[in-house]
Regions:
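Double-stranded beta-helix
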Residues: 10, 14, 19-20, 77, ...
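A short glycine-rich, His/Asp/Glu-containing loop-to-beta-strand
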Residues: 15-51, 56
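Glycine- and acidic-residue-biased ligand/ion/polar-headgroup-sensing regions
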Residues: 55-73
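Short acidic-glycine-tyrosine-enriched beta hairpin
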Residues: 73-94
Length: 128
């Protein structure tokens, strides 16, 4: 068995970065040049922005709760669905989307590393 030379300097990551948001919080579990993994907690009745990304690809996986998910080619043509634990969805660049927590919800997001690639179309917290 061949062991990578990179493992000689391997260190277990012990801390995650927690980022408070108006709708709850994010925990940045892994951030590297290729991808980002986050755990997101959204409190009931709150939502992220109606938004899209120019470069970022992202996938969501619901761990607990219920999320209203809006998705479509533009803000006037959105499909609404409810996501439950075990449901997932992948969003390509330029796809308009929004999550809203029906009840307190926890989900994972895995994405390409374009953390600042957010174009907000609507936001109830004044971040447009």
């Amino acid at each position: 068995m061949k062991v990578s030379k990179n493992l000689k300097n391997y260190k277990m990551k012990k801390e995650v970065t927690k980022v408070d948001k108006p709708w709850g919080w994010e925990k940045w579990i892994e951030v590297n040049e290729n991808y980002v993994v986050k755990e997101l907690y959204m409190t009931a009745g709150n939502s992220c922005s109606l938004q899209y990304h120019e470069h970022k690809h992202e996938s969501f996986y619901v761990l607990s709760g219920e999320l209203k998910f809006l998705v479509g080619p533009d803000k006037d043509n959105l499909t609404e669905m409810v996501l439950y634990p075990g449901d997932y969805h992948t969003i390509e660049p330029f796809v308009v989307h929004k999550m809203e927590a029906i009840v307190d919800s926890l989900y994972l997001e895995s994405s390409t590393n374009f953390l600042d690639d957010v174009i907000r179309l609507e936001d109830k917290y004044g971040r447009v």
